[in-house]
């Protein structure tokens, strides 16, 4: 297994780009597109708050990052909203104008036959049993296994678990598993979302376990790859420093409720964006950035 471990994502991302580009396990061509690929990768982030990066050549675009986060945590799956911020989604959308990889819709809106969302199931599992091994959220579901699917969901699942360290301090750890991830485009937006999920779960659980601390974030990927069209840009990027960045929630405000539905603040933020009301402001800098970077002319 290829393992990269560090306190901050900026260093992890630098090392991942370096290994995938200069020391790939394979050079292959799925769908006729040449890639350099690492397989069976573990990324171990010790500080889930240090979940982004800055680089002189390329950094995550706030005009995409924050609208996508708003879309996810609102539980939506409509192409109409997200396509304003990236035309990529137009290529993989369903005929009815929905998107399979709308992670928030999969976790916070869709309910199972027992009336529970994926997030609600994970939270309730840990509320019932602090040592539970059942706090899992499924992204890729059986309904996605159909021929001709242009958007076969890349993330398989996420799992939370609470464990004590040797000093008896309890931590909430999170693990995600993916079948495939684009190192150039996908991961820089996926990691902030996953770690915000961990932060939100931590906030909800602290109502029941007040001394609970946030723990590690581990990310397992079967294929981390770089497409040939991005090779030159990766070379350029690796010539500059990677500085730590953070996309974190304010613990005084929830993004979602315990059942996965959007919080009051997030609902008001979405309304502000849809109505182009840029004068709405909250005490949460993250929600304010969602509004600022989502409102378009």
Kindly label every feature range from the protein language model.
Residues 1-297:
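Terminal, non-catalytic protein-protein interaction segments that mediate quaternary/complex assembly
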